[in-house]
């Protein structure tokens, strides 16, 4: 597995405090295209938005994330996702700082867990597609039902819009993100976000 994506300047890093000169969007696109061509020539296949591998060597760990699978967060600052038979989906975050993590572990009161929240039904479509549309492979419609616990009718209007915009194509059993959908991935994902209720 090889990841090929643009450097993100994160807060509290040397790059953040002393940012390098970054290429403009046209140069970034040229760099991405050149990398894509060289990887393809070397026998690597793109299987996620920024992930390449030799055939049969996709990162199973990443595939589980992108297919909205469950995983345990173990260690300082780790994140987890757990689905339960009663339909709940829970996101967890462990204590970030090692000293606090060890102190919480030693006290054994909800050991080393910093936050835990239930993913609301209205947030599940966005969470599902935010992960699933990172993959190049077609998305089985049944995966949406199986992993979110929601019927397809909850997203039909948005799916129809995405197809009309050219972001997705559809068969009776699958959705496929298009080249245009990859370019406008943020717009596509925003369409699945729950609307904020006004009070």
Task: Name the predicted role of every residue range.
Residues 1-150:
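C-terminal scaffold of the Radical SAM
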Residues 4, 49, 155, 172-173:
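Residue-level detector of family-conserved "landmark" positions at structurally sensitive sites
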Residues 35-39, 162, 188:
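Hydrophobic alpha-helical packing residues
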Residues 138-139, 168, 198:
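Intrinsically disordered or highly flexible coil/loop and linker segments, enriched in small
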Residues 149-164:
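Short amphipathic alpha-helical interaction segments
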Residues 163-173:
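A short, conserved structural fragment
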Residues 174-178:
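Minor-groove-contacting beta-hairpin "wing" of winged helix-turn-helix DNA-binding domains
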Residues 180-199:
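Short, amphipathic alpha-helical interaction segments positioned at domain boundaries
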